[in-house]
From Swiss-Prot:
The keyword Glycosyltransferase does not apply. The modification Phosphothreonine is found at residue 457. ATP binds at residues 303-311, 326. Keywords: Acetylation, ATP-binding, Calmodulin-binding, Cytoplasm, Kinase, Nucleotide-binding, Phosphoprotein, Serine/threonine-protein kinase, Transferase. The keyword Metal-binding does not apply. GO terms for molecular function: ATP binding; calcium/calmodulin-dependent protein kinase activity; calmodulin binding; myosin light chain kinase activity. It comes from Oryctolagus cuniculus. Residues 297-552 form the Protein kinase domain. It catalyses: L-seryl-[myosin light chain] + ATP = O-phospho-L-seryl-[myosin light chain] + ADP + H(+); L-threonyl-[myosin light chain] + ATP = O-phospho-L-threonyl-[myosin light chain] + ADP + H(+). The gene is MYLK2. The active site is at residue 418. This is Myosin light chain kinase 2, skeletal/cardiac muscle. PANTHER family: SERINE/THREONINE-PROTEIN KINASE.
Length: 608
């Protein structure tokens, strides 16, 4: 609305300042839109037609007309020969200056003042070149078009959780333009085809307000126009969203928008580090005490047993913590020596895939080791369950965790020397998390010193143990290869009718991939096993090399393709029914072994 002193409100210039002409302003504007003929001179002073006056005099500045401030854009005056169409569509409009005599000054159309430029940079031209207060309908549509132009939501993104949508809905502070942001981060979002959103409304005359607004904004802020050009560039199928670095990224939404990550598939398979023990790692020392005063023993809930004693559950009275108690009988001084060695080894093993020691108490007749309680049971007992669907990817998850635990042991210069399926427990009855237990036969390892042992379980013994040769960290890797073979096939590669035949099979390296059983097993899995069950220690893979093997990598991609159930699940069930390792730790006389295997060392099969 134009005031009496000529000031312009809302950035729109009024062409008439006379009080008498205000009443006819709306009628003239509507008539100008419908009929481009020049106004009737009898109605009073008004704008002159450029066709009738092709050589207007130089416009004179009015004292009351505010001069454009620095930074405002003043359009150049078009020449008479360049005028096209009626007034308001490229021609000049003249109006008498209030309080001045002589010929009225020619005012450039749509010349905004500094105040109007700051308030309304998106002001649009109507079809007649001006907006009169008598046209509320057109003004309302212009305001709606300006609001739509400011929103400018991308057309290709429709997911409410997509980070680009989140960014577009969060308006930036008006007092801090985009060009003043300290740093911009462009987030790439795949442009997926979808239904096109309706564009902003158009004003009368078919002028696209959004296009005009972007054009005017580009003239005022070239930097913003360049950024808008980058935003709209979808030539490569990627739309970029400019986001100030001060606002944190919505990482959760981004994970929903992007393709599934590898760890997402791990979560489905419970392939994440097992939960730590319910107590922090501690350095345990053997002490004398009264077990019943500190712990409530539950001997009826047996977890296992062997030659040295039994394992049951217990509860610490002061904290209510449930633990596993390994009771070892002190029959000879060597029994205590072996327990002290086990405590020393476990004090160094602080890893999620290795069982943790809580306390050790000595009584007159026995030693009790209190350890982390693992409720899932043995790995093989778990996978033979009829409700469990075993796939090769499941085996990869199990083997990878075993390799993680072995790698940590070997870094700490510890050899387990009794890796077998019953010494691998599941953390729970539903997931894929496992831990290695039973360090009763573990030994400290120094590569510069020779170490020989003559104990173990025949099926999982390496040739160097059977021959009583020097062992190394590769001795554990042989056992890992046998375990992997059994998980994939359900068969034991060296198992014979008796222990003697089993040990002969180990020494001769007499094993192969059963064609029918391994039909559905990948070549990568076979290669993994073939590089572990090798007679020469130096030719076997280390734990680090196993973790880098292709078979134990790219699990997410393999999980998408793997939907076949392994036959080993059925064969393992038959195997466990035939042979229970818990009751088959047999002490073997060296003299009986020498008769058939021609070995230079004695062999004993011990277990706890």
């Amino acid at each position: 609305m134009a005031t009496e002193n000529g000031a312009v409100e809302l950035g729109i210039q009024s062409l008439s300042t006379d009080e008498a002409s205000k009443g006819a302003a709306s009628e003239e504007s509507l008539a100008a839109e419908k009929d481009p003929a020049p106004p009737d001179p009898e109605k009073g002073p008004g704008p002159s037609d450029t066709k009738q006056d092709p050589d207007p005099s130089t416009p004179k500045k009015d004292a009351n007309t505010p001069a454009p401030e620095k930074g405002d854009v003043v359009p150049a005056q078009p020449s008479a020969g360049g005028s096209q169409g009626p007034a308001g569509e490229g021609g000049q409009v003249e109006a008498p200056a209030e309080g001045s005599a002589g010929k009225p000054a020619a005012l450039p159309q749509q010349t905004a003042t500094a105040e109007a430029s700051e308030k309304k940079p998106e002001a649009e031209k109507g079809p007649s070149g001006h907006q009169d207060p008598g046209e509320p309908t057109v003004g309302k549509k212009v305001a709606e078009g300006q609001a739509a132009a400011r929103r400018g939501s991308p057309a290709f993104l429709h997911s409410p959780s997509c980070p680009a949508i989140i960014a577009s809905t969060e308006k930036l502070p008006a007092q801090k333009p985009l060009s003043e942001a300290s740093e911009l981060i462009f987030e790439g979002v795949p442009a997926t085809p979808g239904p096109t959103e309706p564009g902003p409304a158009k004003a009368e005359g078919g002028v696209d307000l959004l296009a005009e607004s972007q054009k005017e904004a580009g003239e005022k802020a070239p930097g913003q126009a360049d950024q808008a050009k980058v935003q709209g560039d979808t030539s490569r199928g990627i739309e970029f969203q400019a986001v100030p670095s001060e606002r944190p990224r919505p990482e959760v939404g981004q994970a929903l928008c992007l393709p599934a990550r590898e760890e997402d598939c791990f979560q489905i398979l419970d392939d994440c580090p097992p939960p730590p023990a319910p107590f922090p790692h501690r350095i345990v020392e053997l002490r004398t005490g009264n077990v019943s005063s500190e712990f409530s023993m539950n001997s009826k809930e047996a977890l296992g047993g062997g030659k040295f004693g039994a394992v049951c559950t217990c509860t610490e009275k002061s904290t209510g913590l449930k633990l596993a108690a390994k009771v070892i009988k002190k029959q000879t001084p060597k029994d205590k020596e072996m327990v002290m060695l086990e405590i020393e080894v476990m004090n160094q093993l602080n890893h999620r895939n290795l069982i943790q020691l809580y306390a050790a108490i000595e009584t007159p007749h026995e030693i009790v080791l209190f350890m982390e309680y693992i409720e899932g049971g043995e790995l093989f007992e778990r996978i033979v369950d009829e409700d469990y669907h075993l796939t090769e990817v499941d085996t990869m998850v199990f083997v990878r965790q075993i390799c993680d635990g072995i790698l940590f042991m070997h870094k700490m210069r510890v050899l387990h020397l009794d890796l077998k399926p019953e010494n691998i427990l599941c953390v729970n009855t539903t997931g894929h998390l496992v831990k290695i237990i039973d360090f009763g036969l573990a030994r400290r390892y120094n590569p510069n010193e020779k170490l020989k042992v003559n104990f173990g379980t025949p099926e999982f013994l390496s040739p160097e143990v059977v021959n009583y040769d020097q062992i190394s960290d590769k001795t554990d890797m042989w056992s890992l290869g046998v375990i992997t073979y059994m998980l994939l096939s359900g068969l034991s590669p060296f198992l014979g009718d008796d222990d003697t035949e089993t040990l002969n099979n180990v020494l001769s390296g007499n094993w192969y991939f059963d064609e029918e059983t391994f039909e559905a097993v990948s070549d990568e899995a076979k290669d993994f096993v073939s590089n572990l069950i090798v007679k020469e220690q130096g030719a076997r893979m280390s734990a680090a090399q196993c973790l880098a093997h292709p078979w134990l990598n790219n699990l997410a991609e393999k999980a998408k393709r793997c939907n076949r159930r392994l036959k080993s699940q059925i064969l393992l069930k038959k195997y466990l029914m035939k042979r229970r390792w818990k009751k088959n730790f047999i002490a073997v006389s060296a003299a009986n072994r020498f008769k058939k295997i021609s070995s230079s060392g004695a062999l004993m099969a011990l277990g706890v």
